[in-house]
């Protein structure tokens, strides 16, 4: 038990450092999913150098959970990034960051002799709401295209259960609407491997690649293989149109659309197929039941099988085929059809709204009845009703199999899987084992549900000690305030007469819609300095343009406190009170006051004309 470690292990452990994830040239290193996103562009640049190309990279975006610490990780790794020609330039907001990355690909038609590198690739990052607001940029840039040694990866941080968001998010459908193929890693190693494929596919097919990440993956840690040549990229045979698929100028809009619809997506599919990005992980000679899963849901499905007592050998014995989908849109058809052949039924396991399930149903719809497997996912069939569709009955709850809201767990998946498998003719030993395991699962669930927490132990989140929000979110008696995105959102559950909120950058503008129809004459709106810098100044401009009577409390603490305390504006001096006051005067605000517990700080400071300082 206390025997000394072998010498080779002791030597290996003695040389381990926290910087291994960035400094090692080969081997394995311990890292988180976020740190893998830092190492990823280094690996891409190293592979390019191995191919004889001198490339650079731009990383830009806007912080937000579960990618809230990505910018800090990039800053910490600055010395390593610089050695790989990688520039990190945070965006004022998500869409401007995406536009900057579009600019890296426009170097494809820059004047001859002006470029320092053979190509510049890019990584965009943002939270789910940031994906929403970037759709215009994504569509334009994706249709315009990429360069042969450029390429762009857009990384979305999705909060499926609204753990730190005002709404649950699923970026798959936004990426799809913008025409970006969607990668969904299930592990730290996947972040590296699929990230390499995503940029390679972006270069080959002339599209931007999307990558969906969630907390359970990017905030997990693991030992990953960091060899630059680990991933063997296969460029498929594909008949390119005249002029190829890359960015060019001039390029009429309808030509771009036709190139995307008729060639780019199919080039991406050829890449997915050639590199087996979607593949069977469990299969046998007599398979009859199929399971398709992606991302976190794939991990949960494997755990659900274990919880039911179905190891790999038992799955092969029963004829259960498991298919891992790493690119959820577009769903590669040939691989999908091969997976579906010979199966009687397929269960699609994916969190949130259907994206794989609908594509699978479309792909197999015209198969002859004897060959076409039944497909279930979010819903199964009712007794006497074979539809199994989402809109088949007035109340879908009656035949819901795997919920689309919130998230999925191994327990939910195990119950759904057991419900379907128990319809099969299972061997008696397997049947007995599954029923025993289900009893254990049910017992655990009952035990958890029986736990009653003492309400007195509840503790709602509150402002940090010393934070100016403790006092600045209070309003005079008889007044009310509107909330928005930021730490000050917490005032909605405090006794501060704060009701309602908006999306980031919309703070206060609901009053424009209300004031014409209300006897109220005035409201307050809270807005943090981080949101103000991001997009909130436009909400203030809208209120001034509309001429409404509103007081904006620009809550200044010189930090984006919710995501790590980063400086506002990404500059050493941050975004100062003086700058904000001058901007508000220029926008036409009638009364501007600085309220502070240290008024002496502004003695002799050249604030905008008419700005008063109050204690």
Please describe what each predicted stretch is:
Residues 59-61, 154-156, 348-350, 551-556, ...:
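Short internal beta-strands
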Residues 50-98, 114-116, 284-331, 367-378, ...:
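Anionic-ligand anchoring segments at beta-strand to alpha-helix junctions in alpha/beta enzyme folds, i.e.
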Residues 209-211, 355, 426-427, 524-525, ...:
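Acidic/polar loop patches that form or flank catalytic/metal-binding clefts of enzymes
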Residues 454-475, 493:
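Cysteine-cluster motifs in flexible loop/terminal segments that predominantly coordinate metals
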Residues 588-615:
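C-terminal catalytic or substrate-handling cores of phosphate/nucleotide-
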Residues 40, 44, 73, 77, ...:
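Generic, well-ordered alpha-helical scaffold segments in large soluble proteins
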């Amino acid at each position: 038990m206390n025997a000394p470690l072998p010498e080779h292990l002791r030597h290996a452990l003695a040389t381990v450092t926290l910087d291994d994830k960035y400094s090692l040239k080969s081997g394995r290193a311990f890292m988180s999913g976020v740190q893998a996103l830092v190492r990823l562009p280094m690996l891409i640049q190293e592979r390019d150098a191995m191919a004889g190309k001198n490339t650079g990279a731009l990383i830009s975006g806007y912080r937000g959970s579960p990618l809230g610490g990505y910018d800090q990780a990039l800053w910490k790794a600055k010395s390593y990034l610089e050695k790989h020609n990688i520039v990190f330039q945070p965006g004022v907001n998500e869409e401007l960051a995406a536009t900057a990355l579009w600019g890296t690909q426009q170097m494809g038609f820059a004047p001859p002799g002006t470029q320092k590198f053979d190509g510049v690739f890019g990584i965009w990052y943002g939270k789910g709401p940031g994906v929403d607001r970037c759709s215009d940029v994504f569509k334009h840039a994706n249709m315009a295209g990429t360069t042969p040694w450029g390429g762009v990866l857009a990384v979305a941080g999705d909060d499926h259960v609204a753990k730190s968001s005002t709404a649950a998010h699923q970026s798959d459908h936004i990426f799809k609407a913008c025409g970006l193929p969607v990668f969904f890693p299930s592990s730290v190693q996947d972040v590296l491997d699929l990230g390499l494929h995503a940029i390679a596919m972006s270069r080959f097919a002339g599209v931007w690649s999307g990558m969906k990440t969630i907390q359970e993956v990017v905030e997990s840690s693991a030992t990953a293989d960091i060899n630059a040549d680990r991933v063997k990229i296969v460029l498929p045979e594909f008949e390119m149109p005249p002029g190829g698929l890359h960015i060019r100028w001039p390029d009429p809009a309808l030509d771009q659309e036709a190139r995307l619809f008729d060639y780019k997506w199919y080039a991406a599919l050829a890449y997915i197929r050639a590199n087996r990005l979607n593949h069977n992980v469990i299969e046998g000679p007599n398979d009859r039941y199929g399971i398709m899963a992606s991302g976190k849901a794939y991990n949960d499905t494997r755990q659900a099988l274990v919880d039911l007592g179905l190891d790999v050998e038992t799955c092969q014995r029963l004829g259960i085929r498991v298919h891992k989908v790493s690119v959820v849109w577009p769903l590669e058809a040939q691989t999908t059809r091969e997976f579906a052949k010979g199966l009687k039924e397929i269960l699609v396991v994916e969190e949130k709204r259907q994206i794989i399930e609908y594509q699978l149903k479309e792909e197999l719809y015209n198969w002859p009845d004897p060959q076409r497997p039944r497909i279930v996912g979010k819903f199964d069939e009712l007794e006497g009703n074979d539809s199994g569709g989402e809109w088949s009955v007035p109340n879908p709850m009656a035949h819901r199999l795997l919920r689309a809201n919130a998230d999925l767990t191994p327990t939910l998946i195990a119950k759904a899987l057991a419900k379907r498998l128990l319809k099969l003719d299972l061997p008696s030993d397997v049947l007995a084992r599954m029923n025993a395991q289900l009893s254990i699962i049910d017992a655990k669930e009952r035990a958890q549900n029986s736990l009653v927490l003492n309400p007195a132990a509840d503790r709602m989140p509150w402002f940090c000690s010393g934070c100016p929000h403790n006092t600045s979110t209070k309003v005079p008696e008889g007044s009310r305030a509107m909330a928005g995105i930021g730490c000050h959102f917490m005032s909605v559950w405090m006794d501060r007469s704060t009701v309602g909120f908006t999306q980031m950058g919309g703070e206060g503008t609901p009053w424009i819609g209300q004031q014409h129809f209300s006897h109220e004459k005035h409201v307050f709106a809270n807005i943090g300095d981080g949101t103000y810098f991001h997009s909130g100044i436009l909400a203030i401009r809208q209120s001034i343009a509309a001429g409404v009577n509103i007081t904006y409390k620009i809550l200044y603490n010189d930090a984006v406190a919710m995501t790590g305390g980063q400086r506002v504006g990404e500059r050493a001096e941050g975004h100062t009170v003086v700058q904000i006051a001058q901007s508000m005067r220029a926008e036409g605000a009638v009364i501007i006051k600085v309220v502070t517990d240290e008024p002496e700080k502004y003695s002799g400071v050249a604030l905008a004309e008419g700005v008063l300082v109050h204690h």
